[in-house]
């Protein structure tokens, strides 16, 4: 049974569970779609996460009890593929200077580097939420044998567009940032672009993606094309 929590006088959170789970996250997305379809005046932001949906609102425009009732009704929305979701195919160059932790991950899991790369590229990962940094996608779930703790000493600066894993999750850093996840590779794809006013973040919660291994030469070629504005975000959409 979903649980409704108040966050001060300007937000409500609807909780569906207490763990990372694709089924729970699908219910979150279904509730989001159902609520947004109501077009309630007074809502300023709708924030889906792994297991909950938080709605920020203006109590002078939208009655709290009315919003609470709408949220509980939205919690029962049928599960279906959201019209807002997209599927992506993201190129990544693995290992070497681009993925300095690939060898460590291979050793820790008892696999070869090639086997780790093949396993990552064989997964279809779900975007559970966007957080931490603008455009930063939390992806899951990884198979159990790839669940590794975060680094004991985080890096002060993780290169932008780095693909990393920690625990049951994978992620891509859209910006240079401190970080304690294991770096496996890097993508030439731009994950956040303010020039795209309609959708500055490439990914959205509920999207899915796969990775494709590329060479360092292909990475350089694609990164150059992206920087020159020759490749739009639609280029990375899966067929």
Q: Where are these predicted regions, by residue range?
A:
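Glycine-rich active-site loops that engage anionic ligands at enzyme catalytic sites
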Residues: 1-239
